[in-house]
A protein has these predicted regions:
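Conserved active-site and SAM-binding loop architecture
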Residues: 1-134
C-alpha cells in the first residue's frame, strides 16, 4: 500500500504529451520555470525577456548553469558593444544603458562578454519594448 499525503490531493498530476514551451516576460530569476519544475511539468525554456543584467545572470545560474558556451568568442569587443546596445540592456531595471555607458571603463570587456553570453544562453530577447511580432 502506498502512502499519500495531503499534497498529493492538493496538486494534481499534470499530463502533457509535449513539453510546455515556456515564454517568460519580465522573467526575473525564473519563478515560472521554478514553479513548473517543482510541479513536475515537463517544459522547455523557449524564450524570455529580461533586460536587467543582474537578473539575467541569476536566471542563467539557476536554470542554465551547465551552459559555459562562449557565444561571443568570434566577436570583436566592438561587435559585443553594438549587440548589447541594440538589445537595450539595463543594470537598474529602469532605463537602458547608452552605448557610451556600455563602452565606459565602468564595464570591462569581460563583463560585457558575460552579459552577452548570459543573454544567448537564456534565449533572452532582452528589452520587451523593442520586440516586434513576426
Amino acid at each position: 500500500m502506498d502512502q499519500i499525503s495531503m499534497f498529493d490531493l492538493m496538486y494534481p498530476t499534470f499530463k502533457t504529451y509535449n513539453p510546455v514551451r515556456l515564454i517568460e516576460l519580465f522573467a526575473g530569476v525564473g519563478s515560472q520555470a521554478m514553479a513548473l519544475r517543482n510541479l513536475g511539468v515537463p517544459f522547455e525554456h523557449y524564450l524570455m525577456s529580461e533586460w536587467e543584467m543582474h537578473a539575467t545572470a541569476s536566471y542563467k545560474a539557476i536554470h542554465m548553469a551547465d551552459d559555459d558556451t562562449d557565444y561571443s568568442a568570434e566577436m570583436s569587443s566592438e561587435d559585443v558593444i553594438q549587440a548589447l546596445t541594440q538589445l537595450g540592456i539595463s543594470v537598474d531595471g529602469k532605463k537602458p544603458l547608452t552605448e557610451e555607458q556600455i563602452r565606459s571603463h565602468s564595464y570591462s570587456d569581460a563583463w560585457r562578454r558575460e552579459c552577452y553570453n548570459n543573454i544567448k544562453a537564456t534565449h533572452n530577447l532582452v528589452n520587451i519594448c523593442s520586440m516586434r511580432g513576426g
